[in-house]
Amino acid sequence: MAFEIDLLPVGSEKKSGDCIAMRYGDLVNGKEKQTVIVVDGGYVGTWKDTLKPFLRKYYNCEIYGKIHIDLVILSHPDQDHVSGLVEMAKDEDVEIEMIMMHRPWEELSPSWFKDGRITKSSLKDRLGDAFGKAKELDDVTKNISKTRLNVGNYDYQGASITILGPTPDFYKTCIANCEKTPQQEDYVKNLPQTHGSNGPIELEPYRYGNIKWDDNENTSAINESSLIILFEYDGVKVLLTGDAGKKGLTNAINYAHVNNITLNDCNIIKMPHHGSRKNVNPSIMDAFVGSEMLFYSCVSDDLGHHPSKRLINFMKEKRFKQYSTSGKTLHWGKNAPDRGWNDVSDYGFYNEIEI
């Protein structure tokens, strides 16, 4: 049996995005003997310009003239993750079997918000408007099976998919804290506010073993709502983190520990939010030590923010191999057909890192 994963180049003009394709099973002797999964779809143009031609060329997944995708996973409803999935779902050349996605307009009740005038119906409309692209994806795939999401393990066509987070309560807390939603009730826990600059960065000389971390930098509530998924198949382990932040990742690591799930032996960890240092801290990164490779999805010209030089050097000290898309498709496989592609070099140490 075989497995392969591809992080496709998404974004331009300093704006990164996520689009991941995976397939496993018998990748040689018939299209019906493999399973194809797409995780996030990048921007509006990603489907037509990148993902669709890629699937046709490399995944051999056209059945009776349609591109067959067994499972689509939306990590969270940010534009750089969901927009391309909408275009894919609208395409008459595509057949999708199943979708895993949160639907906040179906999952939250008016009791989470202060405005006493909100009814269940009006809240559904407001959340649908707030997360318009995700709602559009839900609408155009209304006849496709969707799984109600919770932490736990799902057996899927010979593979194991474990949702490590978020729990339903933490997910609802994230949505209630989102800038796009009404003001949450007092009993709803506040998440740390987003801090950190997106402007030009300042650098300082790097000194081995002396990297400091600012735990006051945080990601957004909507990023914290990201699905964190451990995929396992035939000895392969891949951890997918969406744009999850420190709270979500810490919760997921704790859940894994309580349930005897190891995260220090993964083949690949897709690092959150294009390699932003705001999403992780040393204790989170230490939980991954022993795993093999870290993958980053980012454009090549991102003002130096993604991936973080501080993060790259910290993980180099932990002996990780690290790779990024940076305008190219990032591929890894086990027993997969040879594409004749060249190996890519992993990151070395930076001489300077962000202050």
Language-model features, listed with the residues they occupy:
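Active-site environment of divalent metal-dependent phosphoester hydrolases
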Residues: 44-46, 77-83, 106-109, 170, ...
